[in-house]
């Protein structure tokens, strides 16, 4: 039986991504308003975020204040045929509710070619729903040891992407527990909410998994606590907020300075 390949901490070094990055930057050129409730952010931390459809990960890659390694669907690390099928059938049709047809198939086929370069540049590692999750946890520990934060999107998006999250999977809880078992340190976990449509990013104060372990909560219950906190950020700071316009605010500040 062939030995399974060990995952390495991604460096983000990719010549193709350097070529593609200006396109990504143009697509997400509208800088979000960052509401930082946490103050100075730890470099070594876990971050749990909503996905904001396909837009959250690239937007956070560009605008989150700390360097991160990200968890991504393992299907996106397969061959071109597997990536195309996943993007067409799961991502576009099932989750984004796009109509099946040649346009959706062509879009999936084209983006499946670009995906490996983008994933590599964004420092993504594959995550799994089976025993192979151990590989993801192992490489995530190595990333934390290198003072990189680990950004995880734990929402259950099987029925699509929604503003209000219905469930968090507990993989991030397992990572925090593993770090605590190895290092004796209760690593900070930052709940955040990203709205690409309104151009708002909210970063909450860190929470700590061991606080809830001591209360007798299991992994799934702890994951629900964090899910509720992320939803709370949406209701408090995003739901009724107007679309943020960075350029308009910049002009207004410039005008205010001149008038003084």
Feature-to-residue mapping (PLM):
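Non-catalytic C-terminal accessory region of glycerolipid acyltransferases
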Residues: 2-7, 134-260
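Short, charged N-terminal beta->alpha structural module
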Residues: 5-21
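Soluble or luminal CAZymes and related metallo-dependent hydrolases
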Residues: 11, 15, 49-52, 131-135, ...
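A short, well-structured juxtamembrane/interface segment
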Residues: 19-44
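A generic local structural motif
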Residues: 30-35, 56-57, 112, 137-138
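Residue-level detector of flexible, active-site-proximal loop/helix-junction positions
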Residues: 39, 75-77, 131, 196, ...
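Catalytic core of membrane glycerolipid acyltransferases/transacylases, capturing the structured
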Residues: 42-129
């Amino acid at each position: 039986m062939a030995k399974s390949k060990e995952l390495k901490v991604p460096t983000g070094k990719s010549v193709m991504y350097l070529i593609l990055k200006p396109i990504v930057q143009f697509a997400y050129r509208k800088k979000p308003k960052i509401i930082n409730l946490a103050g100075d952010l730890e470099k070594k931390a876990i971050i749990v975020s909503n996905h904001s459809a396909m837009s959250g990960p690239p937007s956070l890659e560009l605008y989150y204040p700390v360097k991160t390694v990200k968890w991504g669907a393992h299907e996106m690390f397969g061959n071109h045929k597997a990536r195309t099928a996943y993007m067409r059938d799961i991502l576009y049709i099932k989750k984004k509710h796009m109509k099946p047809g040649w346009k959706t198939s062509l879009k999936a086929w084209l983006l499946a070619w670009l995906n490996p370069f983008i994933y590599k540049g964004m420092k993504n590692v594959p995550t799994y729903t089976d025993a192979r999750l151990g590989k993801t946890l192992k490489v995530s520990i190595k990333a934390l040891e290198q003072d990189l934060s680990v950004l995880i999107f734990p929402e259950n998006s099987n029925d699509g992407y929604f503003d209000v999250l219905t469930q968090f999977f507990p993989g991030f809880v397992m990572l925090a527990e593993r770090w605590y078992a190895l290092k004796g340190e209760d690593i900070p976990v930052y709940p955040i909410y990203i709205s690409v449509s309104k151009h708002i990013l909210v970063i909450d104060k860190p929470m700590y998994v061991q606080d809830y372990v001591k209360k007798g909560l299991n992994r799934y219950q702890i994951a629900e606590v964090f899910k509720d906190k992320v939803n709370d950020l949406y209701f408090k700071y995003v739901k009724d907020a107007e679309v943020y316009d960075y350029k308009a605010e910049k002009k207004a500040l410039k005008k205010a300075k001149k008038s003084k």
